[in-house]
A protein has these predicted regions:
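ER/secretory pathway lumenal C-terminal domains and tails of membrane proteins involved
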Residues: 1-30, 47-192
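Phosphate- and divalent-cation-binding pockets in alpha/beta enzyme and binding domains
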Residues: 42-46
């Protein structure tokens, strides 16, 4: 076993670090990037939390986005410094309440994560600026009859961000998980 040690030594393995660095630097300041799962999320979290790289980018793991605990964690995260500066300085006692990353209550989270949401293909419209909007078709993503929790939450996050943060999908996110937004996505580095 000791003779094979050199094959398993990761001392100079920079793939995960380089991947994370390049992925985060594909995003504009204060961006939100949706990642596919553990293998493409953990390197980003590591480089942000341990190395301090691009902590302004909010990383959202689509696999975990199907769980109530993760949705609550995202909702309750303290804002990044740049988000904090953009908050409406509303106070309740000594606490700044301003805006949250996700603006839904526990009851709404329970409703969304309680099961699949029956869905027929329909157009979804979000305002972009005061006089403009984007419209795209959202098709059922589960058994051609329902939306997954992550799909509902992608729409919720885009709506709640109110176009104050650029939205990205990692290159590892399959087209089926981009909720029909392909016509509005453009590849920039390792993100759409």
């Amino acid at each position: 076993m000791a003779s094979k040690h050199r094959y398993y030594n990761r001392a100079h393995g920079y793939v995960a670090w380089d991947y994370a660095y390049n992925m985060l630097n594909s995003c504009e300041p204060n961006g939100i990037i949706f990642t596919n799962g553990d293998n493409d999320t953990f390197p980003l979290w590591y480089i942000q939390e341990v190395e301090g790289v691009r902590k302004d980018v909010r990383v959202v793991n689509l696999s975990l986005l199907n769980t109530p605990w993760y949705i609550k964690q995202l909702r309750d995260l303290r804002p990044t410094a740049s988000e904090y500066n953009n908050l409406i300085q509303e106070r309740e006692g000594n606490e700044i309440i301003g805006q949250r990353f996700i603006k839904i209550g526990d009851g709404d989270i329970k409703d969304i994560t309680n099961g699949l949401t029956r869905w027929k293909t329909r157009d979804v419209t979000f305002p972009v600026q005061s006089d403009q909007q984007i419209t795209w078709s959202v098709k059922p993503t589960f058994a051609k009859q329902a939306l997954k929790v992550q799909d509902m939450m992608i729409m919720q996050i885009i709506n709640d961000a109110n176009w104050t943060s650029p939205i990205y999908f990692a290159v590892t996110v399959s087209p089926g998980n981009r909720i029909g937004l392909e016509n509005y996505l453009e590849m920039e580095g390792l993100a759409y």
